[in-house]
UniProtKB/Swiss-Prot annotation:
Keywords: Ribonucleoprotein, Ribosomal protein, RNA-binding, rRNA-binding. GO terms for biological process: translation. PROSITE patterns: RIBOSOMAL_S8 (PS00053). The gene is rpsH. It comes from Bradyrhizobium sp. (strain BTAi1 / ATCC BAA-1182). Transmembrane segments: none annotated. This is Small ribosomal subunit protein uS8. Belongs to the universal ribosomal protein uS8 family. It comes from the Bacteria. GO terms for molecular function: rRNA binding; structural constituent of ribosome. The lineage of its organism: Bacteria, Pseudomonadati, Pseudomonadota, Alphaproteobacteria, Hyphomicrobiales. Part of the 30S ribosomal subunit. Contacts proteins S5 and S12. InterPro entries: Ribosomal_uS8, Ribosomal_uS8_CS, Ribosomal_uS8_sf. One of the primary rRNA binding proteins, it binds directly to 16S rRNA central domain where it helps coordinate assembly of the platform of the 30S subunit.
């Protein structure tokens, strides 16, 4: 199945799986999705992920979701930049999510990274989504 916005699809799959208290969720594989999941893993929002190769040649990513006291670690996950309205920001104007308790995930010339990493690297970019 082809999706026009793979990041929104990934976010929706994670949100829906956590509402149903699923421990794992699968999504079609891509380098961009893997990069986004690597940021979520390094920030502690998911336990991990694994890429699964099928004999047909396509790949899937299995995401292991994270819970604390039975509640999902991700309270809110919202898409910011959409195909119809791209949102770009400079390093000076990077948004703080819930006063620094959450993160913004950005696509920068140096790769996909969290907002604090972008500040350290002094780069701006496209704000993909926010997590709290």
């Amino acid at each position: 199945m082809s999706t026009h916005d793979p990041i929104s699809d990934l976010i929706t799959r994670i949100r829906n799986a956590q509402m149903r208290s699923k421990s794992k969720v699968t999504t079609p594989g891509s380098k961009m999705r893997a990069s986004v999941l690597e940021v979520l893993k390094s920030e502690g929002y998911i336990r991990g992920y694994a890429t699964l190769e099928h004999p047909s040649g396509r790949s899937e990513i299995e995401i292991e979701l994270k819970y604390f006291d039975g509640e999902p670690v991700i309270r809110e996950i919202e898409r910011v930049s959409k195909p119809g309205r791209r949102v770009y920001t400079s390093v000076k104007n990077l948004p703080r999510v819930n006063n620094g308790l959450g993160i913004s995930v950005l696509s920068t010339p140096k790769g996909i990274m969290a907002d604090h990493s972008a500040r350290d690297a002094n780069v701006g970019g496209e704000v993909l989504f926010t997590v709290f």
